[in-house]
């Protein structure tokens, strides 16, 4: 009998914990810089997200797939219903011209725990004055 009561209580506690949590929802998960020249290799964009859960949301980490892509993000906890941002800077200096697509992995204390956002674009060669 004690085992059944213990298991029942653990199940109820687990279900309650599952429903009370932070939840991240991005306005968009991809951004296209379009075509730009290697004369202006630094491109920036902002991703906005909302905490649609019922607990404060914390971004624990934002990591890019390449050193040429730098994410910065809201460091303070985001209350339920509030918004935060992830700013992404792509620096194509010393990179080959052409199309690129970079992933940024966002880790949070909420659901989903891991979200990937993407930036892409096409960098063209600088025009030479001949």
Locate predicted features.
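Bacterial Sec-dependent N-terminal signal peptides
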Residues: 1-23
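Buried hydrophobic-core signal for structured, non-transmembrane domains
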Residues: 17, 45-51, 88, 102-107
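Beta-sheet-dominated interaction scaffolds and their linkers
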Residues: 20-48, 52, 123-130
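Hydrophobic core residues within well-ordered beta-strands of beta-rich domains
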Residues: 43-45, 58, 84, 100, ...
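Short, acidic/polar linear motifs in exposed loop/turn regions
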Residues: 52-55, 94, 110
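Surface-exposed binding patches on compact interaction domains or structured appendages
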Residues: 54-85
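Short, hydrophobic beta-strand segments
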Residues: 86-94
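Terminal connector regions
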Residues: 96-125
